[in-house]
UniProtKB/Swiss-Prot annotation:
Gene from which the chain derives: rnfA
Family: Belongs to the NqrDE/RnfAE family.
Matching HAMAP family: RsxA_RnfA (MF_00459)
Keyword list, A-Z: Cell inner membrane, Cell membrane, Electron transport, Membrane, Translocase, Transmembrane, Transmembrane helix, Transport
Name of this chain's protein: Ion-translocating oxidoreductase complex subunit A
Organism lineage: Bacteria, Pseudomonadati, Pseudomonadota, Gammaproteobacteria, Vibrionales
Organism name: Vibrio vulnificus (strain YJ016)
Pfam families: Rnf-Nqr (PF02508)
Subunit structure: The complex is composed of six subunits: RnfA, RnfB, RnfC, RnfD, RnfE and RnfG.
GO BP annotations listed: electron transport chain
């Protein structure tokens, strides 16, 4: 049980996919201008990333390895991610039309988020068990959402601040992301 908690903490804080492994930078920079959109993207990504980790583990264990076609891993995981995103979109559309309208554009964008594919591939490369795959995927998603929401709230505050002209826009956003990355480096010794 302790190793699962350490895996979760390590994935969320120590080995954050955005700030340490630099995966998912496109939605991190593109969707973080407003807090509401960052929360919507974070929730949708959390569900998809967790489900994609589970499905990728099952595809690897029960299809690719028994048939000795591991070389199709990347293509099959991309297909799995697309199916999970489409399934998520259909379920959200049927069960909660309000949430579907809120998340509208964000659900299809998750298919192109490299963090989702990265988590699925790293799960297999690190030989995680089924439960560890779930925890790793969920932890990566929570870490992504945490960083995205924190960054969006900082960008909203910075947009109201008096920033010098050369630093406005993407420049101050990159500086802020760098400072966030430095702050998360403080967690480095927390988990081995």
């Amino acid at each position: 049980m302790t190793e699962y908690i350490l895996l979760l903490i390590g994935t969320v804080l120590v080995n954050n996919f955005v700030l340490v492994k630099f995966l998912g930078l496109c939605p991190f920079m593109g969707v973080s201008k407003k807090l509401e959109t960052a929360i919507g993207m974070g929730l949708a990504t959390t569900f998809v990333l967790t489900m994609a980790s589970v499905c990728a583990y099952l595809v690897e264990s029960y299809i690719l390895e028994p048939l000795h076609i591991e070389y199709l891993r990347t293509m099959s995981f991309i297909l799995v991610i697309a199916v999970v995103v489409q399934f998520t979109e259909m379920v959200v559309h049927k069960t909660s039309p309000t949430l579907y309208r809120l998340l509208g554009i964000f659900l299809p964008l998750i298919t192109t988020n490299c963090a989702v594919l990265g988590v699925a591939l790293l799960n297999i490369n690190e030989n995680h068990s089924f439960v560890e795959s779930i925890i790793y995927g969920f932890g990566a998603a929570v870490g992504f959402s945490l960083v995205l929401i924190l960054f969006a709230s900082m960008r909203e505050r910075i947009s109201a601040a008096d920033v010098p002209a050369p630093f406005k826009g993407a420049s101050i956003a990159m500086i802020t992301a760098g400072l966030m990355s430095l702050a998360f480096m403080g967690f480095t010794g927390l988990v081995k």
